[in-house]
Amino acid sequence: MIITIGGLPGTGTTTISKLLSEKYGLSHVCAGFIFRDMAKENNMTLQEFSNYAEKNSGVDNEIDRRQVEAAKSGNLILEGRLAGWILKKNDMVPDLSIWLKADPMVRCKRISEREHENVDLALEKMLLREASEKKRYKEIYNIEIDDLSIYDLVIESSKWGATGVFNIIEKAIK
């Protein structure tokens, strides 16, 4: 089974991916973790690495390559804003493709708590990161991140919370 889970920062993709991975014994491959690792490898902050990635499509190509390679083995949760799109562009069809969404201020608050930083700073960083990613996705892939047409499920995570989102997905899997 291959499940893709996407969503903007703070929507709960990692939380849900971990819950599903544990419940169903699936590997969890996260594009965001790959990106963060690559930023650290290059001694850059996330924002610096995002700016670098805007000018160097090799960053995205490497993340994509790793995701596709992992998906070939099956039995995984593939988490990332473009996970569903990357599989589609590589003629791979997941068993279930999910997009999580949430109100921007809810997302900002979640990020602020996770990163232990001021809400205003978290909001500023979140908006900069999203603008950078949106630009990259359009330039590199010709993908509009707001186009949710490829997803089987679109879930409002701020309405349902982690348990509710998990239960909805579990029903879809069965």
Curated annotation (Swiss-Prot):
Sections of the chain in a coiled coil: none
Database matches in InterPro entries: Cyt_kin_arch, Cytidylate_kinase_dom, P-loop_NTPase
GO molecular function terms noted in the UniProt entry: ATP binding; CMP kinase activity; dCMP kinase activity
Cellular location(s): Cytoplasm
E.C. code: 2.7.4.25
Gene Ontology CC terms, in alphabetical order: cytoplasm
Name under which the protein is recorded: Cytidylate kinase
Keywords for the protein's UniProt record, in alphabetical order: ATP-binding, Cytoplasm, Kinase, Nucleotide-binding, Transferase
Organism expressing this protein natively: Methanococcus vannielii (strain ATCC 35089 / DSM 1224 / JCM 13029 / OCM 148 / SB)
Entry binding sites for ATP: G7, L8, P9, G10, T11, G12, T13, T14, T15
Protein family (similarity comment): Belongs to the cytidylate kinase family. Type 2 subfamily.
Catalytic function, reaction form: CMP + ATP = CDP + ADP; dCMP + ATP = dCDP + ADP
Pfam families per the UniProt record, alphabetical: Cytidylate_kin2
GO terms (BP aspect): pyrimidine nucleotide metabolic process
Matches recorded under SUPFAM superfamilies: P-loop containing nucleoside triphosphate hydrolases
Domain of life of the organism encoding this protein: Archaea
